[in-house]
């Protein structure tokens, strides 16, 4: 009988272990109620900064830049406006080493375009910039396609759009000024980055790395190429030339100045047309 009693005791203990214990039960977690504002529009700030390649921000000195943000799916313009402000901190942008994640253009106040959009879902947009607006002949355009996510602001440096080129302007002779055949004339041109910074020897924008030259055209034909040299005046480069004969240029000539830096990808052209006269005209007499 002893073994039977032992077996019964073991069965009782086993049943107690396996029996459910209601007092120790863990209630199931309740799901949280849905967020009633989940589909509400969320204000999303986008900052766009237009800069000149290898240079500063396009600020008020060069007329700034126009920025347009367009919804890719619908083609609808979401925002448009002007970038205005200063060109930025030259020492920080051009001379100070920095890590990739460190702000470059926003360490000090600089020109930017800022807008806030009410977004309910992620959208893909084209952000386009055109400038410098004060120099239409040198104006460039650039576009970048990105995603915008509701509630995720793009600030600090923001979306940086880079324009390539130079502002090249013929300063002398003045565009449209009549030229006298066979006269010895000095061609002068100024060269600046698209942000308005001066291009000159030994500067942050070193003209020694840039091929700067002039051309004389009759019609579409180049009749002479001129190597231009720094004149010592701000952003000034010059080269002398002789005005062609009237019989060779009855419709006048075109003067062209070119700045080319293949290493950086920056190029700029300035040109103007001039009538050619066969002789000097006497000054007009003023009526008494």
What residues fall within each predicted segment?
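Bacterial N-terminal signal peptides
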Residues: 11-20
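Short, compositionally biased P/S/T/A/G/V-rich stretches that sit at domain boundaries
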Residues: 31-37, 147-197, 278-288
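Short amphipathic, basic-aromatic surface patches that mediate peripheral association
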Residues: 48-59, 190-205
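Short coil-to-beta strand junction motifs in C2/discoidin
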Residues: 59-66, 202-212
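Surface-exposed loop/edge segments in extracytoplasmic proteins
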Residues: 73-81, 218-227, 266-267
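Aromatic sugar-binding surface patches on proteins
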Residues: 88-113, 232-242
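Short acidic/polar inter-strand loop motif in beta-rich domains
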Residues: 120-140, 260-269
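Short, surface-exposed loop/turn segments at beta-strand-coil junctions that are enriched for proline
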Residues: 242-249
